[in-house]
Amino acid sequence: MRVEGKPYTTIWTGEDGASIKIIDQTRLPHRFEIIAISDVEAAARAIAEMWVRGAPLIGVTAAYGLALAMRADPSDANLERASAHLKATRPTAVNLQWAVDRVRRLIESAPPPQRFAAAFAEAGVIARDDIALCEAIGMHGLSLIKTIAAGKPPGAPVNVLTHCNAGWLATVDWGTATAPVYKAHDAGLAVHVYVDETRPRNQGAALTAFELGQHGVPHTVIVDNAGGHLMQHGGIDMVIVGTDRTTASGDVCNKIGTYLKALAARDNNIPFYVAAPSPSIDFSIADGVREVPIEIRSEAEVTHISGLSADGEITRVRLTPEGSRALNPAFDVTPARLVTGLITERGVIKANASALAAAFRERVAG
């Protein structure tokens, strides 16, 4: 996608062909800064401190991180150590585990001197595959938007509600939940996005609004608790969110607050779709509420907030009284019964075990 008219992906190979570069997303939307990553510690820090975030992107970053670990020390011991270190950075998103395991399986039987080149190349394949998956999700989601548009007055926009950032900044390109929106906008369809601010890190207000604006997509930022009100008054035509982990039964783990949006959508008969690339589907578990590990992040993300001051500096301030505790679960689980459909790279499917198994037979067999 584009920033100030220049094409970017969220992660790319450095000029030396043996490092990577990323966009520091903690600085957006007020600063656009690029960081070079040349070792596994930097890759792990980028994931843990959310310089990169979004399930698909942290998976790609972790794959490159494992490759960089092999450049420094291609031993079996370091392969084990680096794999565990990267997996521990963000426990909820299944893409990270999937990508690390994929690279590890490829290289563990290779002679140590060949491991870096093989791992780095495989990370590149994962990155390119992610772009293709997201674009396919965009095309399948476009059909849903077209159907809704056909039932509205000519020229009236399809109003889409989204939560957090499941855009191109959360993937390598296109995004998951935003890919259908970009495809619709590029096809000339009138589309408008209501962007949940998404406390506590405000990734909707900071990131989704930024990328939609860069692409020229009409959008409006709303506070997290406004979505239900808009649904009650006919302001929302459909909801599209992303997923950090979807279970074999169709339960969806996504950014905290997603479950409440699904409940409101069900109460108002509004379709609730989840953009779910197959690497985000975890066929090893079925009960999302009981089995998905939920990351608990720092209290400081709730008690403090960053923004742009009047003098143009990014400033951090306290919101809560000194001494007040905060609880900060990063994700929640939306039961499959509340999901209208999963928009995958293989089409829109029902959120249930049989539909998922039929669509991804090779994953179930494996």
Swiss-Prot record:
Pfam families: IF-2B
Catalysed conversion reaction: 5-(methylsulfanyl)-alpha-D-ribose 1-phosphate = 5-(methylsulfanyl)-D-ribulose 1-phosphate
Record has Manganese as a keyword: no
EC top class named in words: isomerase
Residues the record lists as binding substrate: R53, G54, A55, R90, Q203, N254, K255
One Gene Ontology MF term: S-methyl-5-thioribose-1-phosphate isomerase activity
Positions marked as site (Transition state stabilizer): C164
Keywords: Amino-acid biosynthesis, Isomerase, Methionine biosynthesis
Active site feature: D244 (proton donor)
Listed pathway(s): Amino-acid biosynthesis; L-methionine biosynthesis via salvage pathway; L-methionine from S-methyl-5-thio-alpha-D-ribose 1-phosphate: step 1/6
One GO BP: L-methionine salvage from methylthioadenosine
Annotated EC: 5.3.1.23
Family: Belongs to the eIF-2B alpha/beta/delta subunits family. MtnA subfamily.
Function of the protein: Catalyzes the interconversion of methylthioribose-1-phosphate (MTR-1-P) into methylthioribulose-1-phosphate (MTRu-1-P).
Protein name: Methylthioribose-1-phosphate isomerase
Annotated organism of origin: Methylocella silvestris (strain DSM 15510 / CIP 108128 / LMG 27833 / NCIMB 13906 / BL2)
Upper taxonomic lineage: Bacteria, Pseudomonadati, Pseudomonadota, Alphaproteobacteria, Hyphomicrobiales
